[in-house]
UniProtKB/Swiss-Prot annotation:
Family under the similarity heading: Belongs to the peptidase T1B family.
Keyword DNA damage included in the entry's annotation: no
Regulation of catalytic or functional activity: The formation of the proteasomal ATPase PAN-20S proteasome complex, via the docking of the C-termini of PAN into the intersubunit pockets in the alpha-rings, triggers opening of the gate for substrate entry. Interconversion between the open-gate and close-gate conformations leads to a dynamic regulation of the 20S proteasome proteolysis activity.
Chemical reaction(s) catalysed: Cleavage of peptide bonds with very broad specificity
Chief place of localization: cytoplasm
Name recorded for this polypeptide: Proteasome subunit beta 1
Function: Component of the proteasome core, a large protease complex with broad specificity involved in protein degradation.
Taxonomic source organism: Sulfolobus acidocaldarius (strain ATCC 33909 / DSM 639 / JCM 8929 / NBRC 15157 / NCIMB 11770)
Length: 195
């Protein structure tokens, strides 16, 4: 499969999850926008992705509704694993005409921080760090060299920025700033880094 345009990064920390994605929206060698968001809050969770931005936005809207429905119907909060599995099922149900996106899903629940990687047809993998999209090959090298399980959220944010800057230097389909989501047990913080 061809690499999907954009770069998104996820890092699990000792107390949370950091998701980051750059803002360039490109198709082929044409830059359509320099301000396309690819990182979104989903209640207590977050999602970041590479691929068709409209598909990522649509999946975010669907998941917002599905999470609220689950919690209302079951009278309890959905776990990060159950929410990620729900997203996996939605992707798999559309495998004939898939959402063209590689996704990172993260959050903190009673079992601690969780980070999941999903492909366009719903494969679900839990990991400690990940990079998806056209800049992933460069970004993952930085993550592999510098990741450790004792990272704080602030240190993981700095690692995500460093990793993304490396990817942006080498990948023409990525660039124009970094959106960051820091998810802890009690809060979700958003940040934007201009590059």
């Amino acid at each position: 499969m061809e690499e999907l345009p954009a770069t998104a990064i996820g890092i699990k920390t000792k107390d949370g999850v950091v998701l980051a994605a750059e803002r360039r929206l490109s198709y082929g060698d044409f830059v359509l926008s320099k301000s396309a968001r690819k990182v979104f809050k989903l209640g207590r969770f977050g999602i970041a992705g590479a691929g068709i931005v409209g598909d990522i936005q649509t999946l975010t809207r669907i998941m917002n509704v599905e999470i609220k429905y689950y919690e209302m119907y079951n009278s309890r909060k959905i776990s990060a694993r159950a929410a990620a599995k729900l997203l996996s099922v939605i992707l798999y149900q559309n495998k004939v005409l898939p959402y063209i996106s590689e996704l990172l899903f993260g959050g903190v629940d009673e079992d601690g921080p969780k980070l999941f990687i999903l492909d366009p047809i719903g494969s679900l993998i839990e990991d400690s760090y990940a990079a998806v999209g056209s800049g992933a090959r460069v970004a993952i090298g930085v993550l592999e060299a510098e990741y450790n399980e004792s990272l704080t959220s602030e240190a993981a944010k700095e690692l995500a920025i460093k990793s993304m800057k490396s990817a942006v230097e080498r990948d023409v389909m990525s660039g124009d700033g970094i959106d960051i989501l820091i998810i802890n047990k009690n809060n979700i913080y958003e940040d934007f880094i201009k590059i």
